[in-house]
Curated annotation (Swiss-Prot):
Binding site for ATP: E187, H250, Q251, S252, R319, R324, K331
Binding site for Mg(2+) 2: E139, E192, E199
Organism: Methanococcus maripaludis (strain DSM 14266 / JCM 13030 / NBRC 101832 / S2 / LL)
Full protein name: Glutamine synthetase
Record-linked PROSITE patterns: GLNA_1, GLNA_ATP, GS_BETA_GRASP, GS_CATALYTIC
EC number: 6.3.1.2
Any one GO molecular function term: metal ion binding
Lineage of source species: Archaea, Methanobacteriati, Methanobacteriota, Methanomada group, Methanococci
Span of domain GS beta-grasp: 14-106
Function in brief: Probably involved in nitrogen metabolism via ammonium assimilation. Catalyzes the ATP-dependent biosynthesis of glutamine from glutamate and ammonia.
Binding site for L-glutamate: N243, G244, R301, E307, R319, R338
Length: 446
């Protein structure tokens, strides 16, 4: 059987009556068109045609896509991603398939975030025989509604706590089972540092599959929380005074089918490729965060304290540096970029991280010496003496860095780059001109 026939067999076996053709906008927010599966020979013929060729949609209302005068677009399903949604009824079930966005002339749409990542990966493969693997650690909060109608942390537990303190153990159990039904290899789940904060870790994979998984992960958790009358949020810093939510990204590149970060004879057992990749990440870090930390709120997390990864340095085990190389060495040697948060569009975030790292490899950059001291405890003068800079303090400063970065501009492509800058500058202006509760409390007495 070909791929379409296999998909039709899966649909029949699982009694699928609706298929969600899913894609994401420039923010990484999932969108979909629900296609009803029809009975009879005519229905089967139509289904085959849709699975093979895709479905048309109007792209003019999708932020960051196209204008109304050129709005017709097509969703072409990646049939490897077809999966029944485990939270929907098993009778007359609902499946989703992740799609690539195409123009009506049959070419990949340059504003499709998934297509953007695939384009950069294809170039990497063509030039260096390269593969990019990512293992993210997205954190999130589970909230409950209090008597005043406010959303507050659903439990009072802390890091690695057990029930009864850990009031989120039941919802995490449901999340793990649902993710496994969706094909995830879940490695661990636990309560995080802050009240109501959680983490569920899943196995690394190639960058496109991992980005698909991040989108599915967030949808699954939000849906299951809502079914229990709770709210799941991936907002980077929902509450003042406690840790925010990050999405540390473990990553490695393979060249010609072999891992490229390990060298038993080298200092720290890290290859020249690894050192140059780290140097590239550090060199572009101030621009990268505009994409990996893309909201005004992201920079409420990226402040000194609360274990925030603001220091542009690398280390072997020191978590106060923005890049860390975890202890295991060998085939699984990887680096960890600690700045990203789960508000990012994973396709675009992985694109800019890879582009930055590969720029370091191509330029044969040398990484500075690792900083194994606690950078959080250093004064600004001490950090300056060590040559340790910080990421931008707000979204606008990060956007200004990105706007002048030709490497990341080329990776994102003209369409996404210009739309991202425009949309995010508008977001910053909206924030900048808003009058906040803090200002009212502080200045109303004047």
């Amino acid at each position: 059987m070909n791929a379409v026939e296999q998909a039709m067999e899966y649909i029949k076996t699982n009694n699928v009556k609706f298929i969600r053709f899913q894609f994401v906008d420039i923010h990484g927010e999932p969108k979909n068109i629900a296609y009803p599966v029809k009975a009879g020979a005519a229905g089967e013929e139509e289904l085959y045609d849709v699975l093979e060729k895709g479905v048309y949609f109007d792209g003019s209302s999708i932020e960051g896509f196209v204008s109304i005068e050129s709005s017709d677009m097509m969703l072409k399903p990646d049939l490897k991603t077809l999966s029944v949604l485990p939270w929907r009824p098993t009778e007359k079930s609902v499946a989703r398939v992740i799609c690539d966005v195409y123009t009506t002339n049959g070419k990949p749409f340059e504003g499709d975030p998934r297509g953007c990542l695939k384009r950069v990966l294809a170039k990497f493969d063509e030039e260096l025989g390269g593969e990019f693997f990512v293992g993210p650690e997205p954190e999130f909060f589970i909230l409950k509604e209090d008597a005043c109608g406010s959303w507050v942390p659903a439990d009072d537990a802390g890091y690695f706590d057990l029930e009864p303190l850990d009031g989120g153990c039941d919802i995490r159990r449901k999340i793990v089972f649902a993710l496994e039904n969706l094909g995830f290899h879940v490695e661990a789940s636990h309560h995080e540092v802050a009240e109501g904060q959680h983490e569920v870790d899943f196995k690394f994979a190639d960058a496109v599959k991992t980005a698909d998984s991040v989108v599915t992960f967030k949808t699954t958790i939000k849906t299951l929380a809502a079914q229990d009358g709770l709210k799941a949020t991936f907002m980077p810093k929902p509450f003042f005074g406690i840790n925010g939510s990050g999405m540390h990204c473990h990553q490695s590149i393979w060249l010609n089918g072999e891992p490229s970060f390990y060298d038993e004879s080298a200092q720290y057992q890290l290859s020249e490729t690894c050192m140059s990749y780290v140097a590239g990440i550090l060199d572009h870090a101030k621009s990268i965060v505009a994409v990996t930390n893309p909201t005004v709120n992201s920079y409420k997390r990226l402040v000194p304290g609360y274990e925030a990864p603001v220091n542009i340095a690398w280390a072997n085990s020191n978590r106060s540096a923005i890049v860390r190389v975890p202890a295991p060495r060998g085939k699984g040697t990887r680096i960890e970029f600690r700045a990203p948060d789960p508000a990012c569009n994973p396709y675009l975030a992985f694109t800019v991280m890879l582009a930055a790292g590969l720029d370091g490899v191509k330029r044969k950059l040398s990484a500075i010496e690792p900083v194994e001291k606690n950078i959080f405890a250093m004064s600004e003068a001490q950090k300056k003496a060590e040559g340790i800079e910080s990421v931008p303090a707000n979204l606008k400063a990060a956007l200004d860095e990105l706007e002048n970065n030709s490497v990341l501009k080329d990776a994102l492509g003209k369409h996404i780059f210009e739309n991202f800058i425009e949309i995010k500058n508008a977001e910053w202006d909206s924030f900048r001109t808003a009058v906040t509760d803090w200002e009212t409390k502080q200045y109303l007495k004047i």
